[in-house]
Amino acid sequence: MSKSHLFTSESVSEGHPDKVADQISDAILDAILAQDPRGRVAAETLITTGLIVLAGEITTTAVVDYADVARQTVRRIGYNSSDMGFDWASCAVVQTLDKQSPDIAQGVDEGAGLDLDQGAGDQGLMFGFACDETDVLMPTPIYFAHRLTERQAMVRKDGRLPWLRPDAKSQVTVRYEDDRPVAIDTVVLSTQHAPDISHADLVEAVREEIIKPVLPPEMIHKDTKYLINPTGRFVIGGPVGDCGLTGRKIIVDTYGGQGSHGGGAFSGKDPSKVDRSSSYAGRYVAKNIVAAGLARRCEVQVAYAIGVSQPVSLMVDTFGTGVIDDDRIAALVQEHFDLRPKGIIQMLDLLRPIYAKTAAYGHFGREEPEFTWERTDKAAVLRDAAGLR
């Protein structure tokens, strides 16, 4: 008898206030890296009615107009009118930015501190995950949740649904049988809108223009449930509806609740922060393990101590799907991947202004040319090393 269960993941649009904050923080990071690839950045953003607050620690030689970077990010997202409740041109921007602590810097700088190699920017544990449910080796629920919010932004910006506004959320519930995705059980999509669109017209348009083009027909069945703006009205949204903060959508950013999470956010952090760079490396490792056919499902944990270059631990878990022992796969990882902070930065070419694009619709499962952690260029090497033919 087959074993059945439901699993749900959510996504939020680029206009969700927490994602606006993430995008501002990563736009600041990109502006610095474009001039100073070795800049140290921990940029935090708060956004609320009529106000953006920029805080954090930044050490750089770059000259950046942080307020303008924040405003232009909000403009690109689409909050361009007081009628929406937030206007990029008239909002206030408050800055309180300090330099990185020299005590932290000496542990990170190569040639300084007790470990003369580049050390980790903090202690912590990070996870990477991959599975063979989709072509991009991501879990099905989060993959389609992201595609729905991406589609909402597309049809808003290209004028097909001009009454849409930037804030939106999606949620996809998938039915699994014997741990394989077989059907979509429930779709939730809530989108901000202009006040003059009726609920009935909105529901029809969202279903036809956003949901149907995204979800595969073979996963839809007669009992699939669609909950579109289930409160009935979503006019007040964005930073007016909720205060946004950097780093509050860490499950949306990763695997939608499948796999584990070490707790560290990504946006606004330069790659010397292992919260970000090691999570990207973990995805790179896990994806190559699955792409190599060593497992159908794989989670990698790596942990660090501040100022120390070598990881303090490495764990591989294939959830019983591995074709060789997990310990053997972990040994192959140590042999073929350099998981020191400096090694990760070089391996994935992370000292580039590539991060604003990561800050909405997921850091993983998007095969953009800049997303080097999505490559599967180690798969053949791993397969050969494992003795698979």
Swiss-Prot record:
Binding-site positions, K(+): E44
Xref: CDD domains: S-AdoMet_synt
Residues given in the record as L-methionine binding sites: E57, Q100, D242, K273
Sorted UniProt keywords: ATP-binding, Cytoplasm, Magnesium, Metal-binding, Nucleotide-binding, One-carbon metabolism, Potassium, Transferase
Transmembrane segments: none
Entry EC number(s): 2.5.1.6
Pathway: Amino-acid biosynthesis; S-adenosyl-L-methionine biosynthesis; S-adenosyl-L-methionine from L-methionine: step 1/1
Subcellular location: Cytoplasm
Domain of life per record: Bacteria
Cofactor note: Binds 2 divalent ions per subunit.
GO biological process: one-carbon metabolic process; S-adenosylmethionine biosynthetic process
NCBIfam families referenced in this protein's UniProt entry, alphabetically: metK
Family statement drawn from the similarity comment of this UniProt entry: Belongs to the AdoMet synthase family.
Protein name (database record): S-adenosylmethionine synthase
Lineage: Bacteria, Pseudomonadati, Pseudomonadota, Acidithiobacillia, Acidithiobacillales
